Amino acid sequence: MSKSNSIFPVLFCAAGIYASFLTWALVQEPLTTQVWENSHKRFQCPNVIAVVQAVAAVCVGYFYMRAKGAQRNYGAIAMVRDYAKPLALISFTQSASSPLSQYALQYVDYLTYMLAKSCKMIPVLLVHLIIYRTTISRKKSVVAVLVSIGVTIFTIGGSKGKISGSISGSNDEHFFQKASGFLLLFLSLFMDGLTNATQDKMLKNNRVQMAIQNAETQDKKQQHKVFHTLTGAHMMFALNFFVAIWNIAYLLVIDRGQICNAHAMLKKDPIIVSYLLAYALCGSLGQCFIFYTLELYGSLVLIMITVTRKMMSMLLSIIVFGKTVNATQWLGIVIVFSGITWEALDKRREKKALEAKVQKSE
């Protein structure tokens, strides 16, 4: 799919991601933190939740493919077969990232965790540059750094006076715990970067292969292999298929107790099922917007939208509920919007220059 020059598709993608994140979070909080009436404990079964989420996303992804007409041109099973190795890698890094960051919270404070997650664009850039040798313009790199700095400042500004006490223990133990936490955060961010950059690379490589194939077809050259158009809907279906497999394997081989615990709680508190299904549905609908954005604009724009979500929610609260932000947070907001505005104006300038060049050639 060609990238649109209009700003409306990216605004549509951003609005869809923000809305789905908001509803998803509203269901996630009671599902995972509430002490249920009959079980007298929280539903702490992350891999069971991940399986339900992945299965729901596979189903929604399949219907998303059919709605786009992608299933007719390139079947879901054929896509899984053709891209099994990279899909298995991406789904593994995607499945491993969240647990690593959650384990890191045992050793670092929540602010450090939030700051690390605010800089997700940087590892994506580094994976593109170092592993895949992708050429990224200096302007796009500067925008990524500006957005990361802005979100970091915004997070620090909103967390003043809210940081809990430090980890107890001797200096050596404290250093070891902090080092362990930072290592886990680094691994989590690396997994995030590898996931997003590899998804991006798969879609871009497919577009190049399709362009070459179309050129060979027009020149009537012999084709050694037939390539099919890979869409965000294909990625959503296939990745969740593998995520489900990874988590089911983990539950069956390593943590069967989680299955027994989930079964016992669902039997005592069947209302959890409705929360679980609502959580899975909201997450699946959100993934439609996420993979649509990835298909149209790539991983850097997608990460830019997701890391600025909290900031956008705060701005909405200011407009609707009259909430206030401090000077430090306003500085972060200005930096983020300066970077985004600079990129938007630069793209508009490039578009006008291209149109003028086309008119001149005619």
UniProtKB/Swiss-Prot annotation:
Q: Which InterPro entries does UniProt cross-reference here?
A: SCL35B1-4/HUT1
For this UniProt entry, what's an example GO CC term?
A: endoplasmic reticulum membrane
Which keywords appear in this protein's UniProt record, sorted alphabetically? Endoplasmic reticulum, Glycoprotein, Membrane, Sugar transport, Transmembrane, Transmembrane helix, Transport
Instruction: Show the GO MF annotations.
Output: UDP-galactose transmembrane transporter activity; UDP-glucose transmembrane transporter activity
- Using the UniProt record, give the first listed, main subcellular location: endoplasmic reticulum
- Glycosylation-annotated residues: N196
Query: What is the topology of this protein in the membrane according to its UniProt annotation?
Result: Multi-pass membrane protein
**Which top-rank group of organisms is this from?**
Eukaryota
- Give compartment(s): Endoplasmic reticulum membrane
According to the record, the segments passing through the membrane are 7-27, 45-65, 111-131, 141-161, 175-195, 234-254, 271-291, 296-316, 317-337
Q: Which family does it belong to?
A: Belongs to the nucleotide-sugar transporter family. SLC35B subfamily.
Stated role: May be involved in specific transport of UDP-Gal from the cytosol to the Golgi lumen. Involved in the maintenance of optimal conditions for the folding of secretory pathway proteins in the endoplasmic reticulum.
Q: What is this protein called?
A: UDP-galactose transporter homolog 1
Give the species: Candida glabrata (strain ATCC 2001 / BCRC 20586 / JCM 3761 / NBRC 0622 / NRRL Y-65 / CBS 138) (Yeast)
